[in-house]
Amino acid sequence: MLHTLSHSPWHADIEGLLRMLGDGDELLLIQDGVLAAIDGGRFIEILNNAPIKVIALKDDIDARGLAGQISTKIDVVGYTDFVKLAIKHPTQMSW
């Protein structure tokens, strides 16, 4: 399943998201969800300890001026890879 986090992690149910994770799931951070990928932040530690791959959308990172602040443990992708993820995971959950 592809999980997409589009809201600020401060306004999202991160614990609920973590409970819903399954084998092979991936988390794509989009819109304000990219705030969860800030290196040294509270949420990046939580996500790095989760048993999933975490990915962030480059355009949303750039739009928020966060390019130099994103954890190196996060894969940063463009819209083409976003589409590939959506095809790879026909089941999706938005947070």
Swiss-Prot record:
Record keywords: Cytoplasm, tRNA processing
GO annotation (BP), single: tRNA wobble position uridine thiolation
InterPro entries in UniProt: DsrEFH-like, Sulphur_relay_TusB, Sulphur_relay_TusB/DsrH
tRNA processing among keywords: yes
Transmembrane as UniProt keyword: no
Main location: cytoplasm
Localization terms from the record: Cytoplasm
Source domain of life: Bacteria
A single Gene Ontology CC term: sulfurtransferase complex
Function: Part of a sulfur-relay system required for 2-thiolation of 5-methylaminomethyl-2-thiouridine (mnm(5)s(2)U) at tRNA wobble positions.
Subunit architecture: Heterohexamer, formed by a dimer of trimers. The hexameric TusBCD complex contains 2 copies each of TusB, TusC and TusD. The TusBCD complex interacts with TusE.
Similarity field: Belongs to the DsrH/TusB family.
Protein name (record): Protein TusB
Organism name: Enterobacter sp. (strain 638)
